[in-house]
Amino acid sequence: MTISHNNPPPLHDQLCYAIYTAGIAIQRAYKPLLDELGLTYPQYLVLNVLWSGDEQTVGAIANALALESSTLTPLLKRLETAGLLRRTRNLSNERQVVIALTEEGRALQHRAGCLSDTLLAASMQTPKELADLNHDVRHLRDAIYSQIGGWDAPA
């Protein structure tokens, strides 16, 4: 693909568009199951962060999801209202809010586990193909952030 600074390639030839629309397709594939769980996709992502390590600060969750804390706060409030997590002040640093799963939030992890099966079936890819793609996209993301700054990818 030849890149011209005067005429961008057609939208369907742009990698950013392919990644963007693939993300939308994945969210649409997940939507029926997320609806059953009573979750939005961003709420599901927040819970995933907590399922991998409970009791995290708002800042740590925001960093893991590449979001601003101010964007995350309304999501956390809705998840707390739904009984899936608790927000408490950090006793050693009152400026920090610590997020912890409730029993109901932990129990939801098992029910949400089938989302990866949904992607596998909808994509018509093998598990290895999806793992390789995941690796490549993460590598691209990390390379871009290493150049532009602004996000420390979680390990």
What feature does the model see in each segment?
Residues 34, 47-50, 65-67, 72-79, ...:
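Generic leucine side-chain signal with a strong bias for well-ordered alpha-helical environments
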Residues 4, 8, 12-15, 19, ...:
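Alpha-helix initiation/capping motif
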Residues 22, 26-29, 65, 108-127, ...:
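Alpha-helical linker/hinge and terminal dimerization helices associated
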Residues 1-37, 131, 144, 155:
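N-terminal leader segment of winged-helix/HTH proteins
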Residues 77-138:
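Charged, amphipathic alpha-helical coiled-coil/dimerization segments
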Residues 17-20, 24-71:
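N-terminal helix-turn-helix DNA-binding core of bacterial DNA-binding proteins
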